[in-house]
Amino acid sequence: MRAARFHGRGDIRIEEIPEPVVRPGTVKIKVDWCGICGTDLHEYVDGPIFCPTPEEPHPMTGETAPVVLGHEFAGTVAELGADIDDLSMGERVTVEPRLVCRSCPPCLAGHHNSCDRAATIGLAGGGGGLAEYIVVDRELVFSLGEVTTEAGALIEPLAVAHHAVGRAEIAPGASAAVFGAGPIGLLIVTVLKATGAGHISVVEPSAGRRRRALDAGADAVIDPLVEKADERIRELTGGAGAEVAFECAGVDSVLAGCVAAVKARGTVVNVAIRSHPATLDMIPLVLKEVRLVGTICYAGDHQPVIDLLNAGKLSVDRFITRRIDLDDLVEGGFQALLDGTGDDIKILVRP
């Protein structure tokens, strides 16, 4: 079968590799669509970060580079392990691509997303969604119900957004500010709207992405190049500031802006993954008793997201801005996202 494999920084190749073989307890999936994630871009530009090197195997998978990329994907059941009877051939499914050890202290406490040895399918090994087929453990497979496989390819980033909103512990009707209207920021807006948040402000310098934020359900958009975001957010919240702010840009000044934008004893959720250590003036955080919260991946969020999609409370089709074939992955996918205007949100790839 054909697959996109990461060989090293700036080196992704479309290659012929053997089809994976079904084992007991596993499911073989024919991949329909796979999204390109910001993490994939980080690997391409700055990696290897989460991918293994040719010399050093990943501690969870034992695999070395090259590895198949792609962790945001959906498709149909192509083959079932002999012991699996709760899925059907041709059924639309998606995958939670997180591999965990189940024996470290975070895992034993039920916080599998913070596993000491965690790995991600499509980065660390175990196959990936940028291939025609993948075989995964049954426990990682979720039926989509009436959700299409195109929308299903966005369930993984939706689960990230859903988990981030859950980490905020935001009360119904509470105000929120989202800094950065990239794919995850826009999906956080969508989840906030679907789960009953109050006034939602989005801070984003790109005019195109500000428009998309309004389409996603934001009540106000702010251009930080034109006005001070924290002052405008206080105006929009009766002078208090937002109950919670989500940092989705990965920029130090934006993290400081989130602290400035929330009310006293408000919450800042750091969503972005940074390539370099962050710096933050702690005095404003201390004086306002701001709660700074981290969030990573998801923990039991895939099924709630699928339920929201099937109930019509979430819609993601508007975020799919382009569809390409596997042969166009580097130029039409990775380079387009790196060199483009920022108007592309989610590019889907058909392997």
Residue spans for each PLM region:
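Glycine-rich cofactor phosphate-binding loops and adjacent beta1-alpha1 units
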Residues: A168, R211-R291, G332, D343
